[in-house]
Amino acid sequence: MGTVVGETELNRLNNGLSSNNGSSADEGLEHWNPLKKIHSADSSRRRSTSSQLNQPSNYHMHSSLHEEVSVGSSIASPSSRIPDKAISQYYETSPPSSTSSLSSNNQLMNSSVILSPGQFLPDDANAYGPKASLPPSEMPSHFHPLWSKSASKDSNAFNDPSAIPNPSPLFSSAYATRINGSLRNDKWNRSSFSEALSSSRFSRPQVGQQQPLSSAFPFQPVKQPTEQPGSLHPFMQESKTSPFATRRPSLNTDHHGRPILLSPLNYQNSSLNPSTPSPFGGSPVMHPPVSNLSPRTPAVPMSSDGHLAPAFDFLNENPIWSKRFSISSIKYSAPSTSNASNIAPDSAPPASSQFSVPFNAAAENINDTPDSVLANSPTPRHLPYTWSRHSTSGPSRSTVLNPSTSRMSNYTGLESHLAQLSFKRRSNSATLPSLGSIRPFPISEHSPNINPLDEAAVEDEVKEEKSRFHLGHRRSSTADNGTLSSNVPLYPAYNSSPVQTRTSLFSSRLSKPSNPIVSSVSQANAPKNALHSMPSPTSLANLPSNLSDTQYKKLYNLYLVEFKAGRADVFYIDDNIKLSLNLNDYVVVDADRGQDLGRLIAQNLSQSEVASHIEKIPSDRNGQLQNLDGAILEGDTSQSLHPKRILRKAQPHEVDQLIQKTQDEAQALLVCQAKVRQRKLPMEVLDGEYQWDRKKLTFYYHAKQRIDFRELVRDLFKVYKTRIWMCAVSGTNMSSPASINASTNQFVL
């Protein structure tokens, strides 16, 4: 900020200097100026021009736009009788002390200053006033809360000496040069209140930032420094001008909205501020100082990473805020070989690595990969970034699935996101997902280009099933008339992955709810109506009793398959499918709107064995059903058996999934028990069972009275997004199928 020193202050200063030792004004000036060598060398020239200095004139001083100096701060200057060369002198790197007088030697530069001709420096004497506090020069600048050292920018410095106008006795300060002959003039900048409290000042030393020159007029050209090859310094070269460059809006700085006095010395070459001829010859006389009422160009504090951005470095380790870089537009250059392992590949991982990771590790991979990449890049700190706020429940859907921020494959990120949506709704008593709880699904060879978002629309699929199925549950049977669906097979015939933990559930959709799903092997070998060649076994208990066991086995070829907790059911194999099975083999069978996996415990059942199994089935197993409104739905109450098909023999990797299925069932049991305690229901949940394709989740409970668990089922459906069945049992012992007394079964679509 520029300041005008009038005649009154100059005369008062002259009188004060003269009264110090009772000598003349020149002697007082000698005492005030520590540069005795330079002053003695020019003493004769000053005396010869002293008569010209008696003319009434104002000495204007210019302040750099980088400095943060209050409006009221000023510095006393010599009177009109003092030569102008003394005014052009500069302070030392430390500002003047508030307790020192004008005759103190620390207010002017010391005697070691070397003046080199051909360069001149603007008058910075007004940068520090007598009332300004003195920062300790011994202390590093970045530890001081108010002062910092930066490189000044000389608006009047030109590499061409011919650019200097013809000097005159009134403007002898044009011969002033940079101190110490250096291309950089380090000086002190006073920080604003917000910058002084910023944590970035204490993280690392603040680097002086160069601001472009501003004009007192809104549309006056602003000089932008440019660096050209072979130049000594970018600020010593000619600068390009922008014809419509104006001041930008100011931030909350000390000079916001206050007038800034600018010396006409800045605009001697400007066409908007014409000059008049000087009565003494030489350089023209400038107009009086102009008051600039526009906001001052703000000095934006620099963050620790070198960006001209708000200093939010204290948020780097904050769990709520994080810095997000735009990776999609980055063109990586060749990194160093030592840190090459930290850089994530741009391409998706191969098919052999499409397996899940824990969600916490997945989130760290998403958040930390951009930072690790940028840390090893040759130019990492010039990239745009934004501050994003985390959700308390984990990364949002757009954060995990956004390809510009995630370095994982779409399938792994999608599965991690779906698992997080499922587990974050659990109660506090439930355990967090383990390593195997988040399972990827293999990409079907028949649909390699299907968008994962289309395949994984679980909620849309559930809504679609509402319109397909009625509330009353009906067991699937081969007696239904209709054409089999020829959709893409649900499971591939062979899977090269030996450690697969979950199969795909999103690639097939039924066109008819009661039609069974045919595997790729059986669908390729079976004719169109092969599965309907068997007589309708709607009620095997009503078959004629005069059939022999051989005829019975030849006609029906029934098998008994056991599932969890001793639950068993009767199945058959189509005669047109050549499938050789042995006892204790694991088979994939038709189940309730899906597929299940069980162990073969009996084959070629005789009529007596079937009758014995029918007697163990409770009469109300398929009887009373409740819908969501609690209404009783009448069903088939007779003791009948509806066998289903055995699709194929289970693969080894499918059998390995039973271990993970058991772990998921244990977690589901904990969640259900926590929900029961939360709602204070008088019931005891004994066990939980997943259907092998995860399309159905059954909870076995024991209660002494009728339980209204509709709200409980809704809560469980929000967590698992699958059909929930509540099956009542007679007691805590579930070792045999006879112990199951399914008095109430409820499901949710």
From Swiss-Prot:
InterPro entries: PSP1-like, PSP1_C. It comes from Schizosaccharomyces pombe (strain 972 / ATCC 24843) (Fission yeast). Residues 149-159, 238-252, 265-275, 388-405 have a biased composition (Polar residues). This is Uncharacterized protein PB7E8.02. PROSITE patterns: PSP1_C (PS51411). Pfam families: PSP1. GO terms for molecular function: mRNA binding. Residues 1-58, 124-170, 200-291, 385-405 are annotated as: Disordered. One of its GO terms (cellular component) is cytoplasm. Residues 644-729 form the PSP1 C-terminal domain. Residues 13-24 have a biased composition (Low complexity). It comes from the Eukaryota.
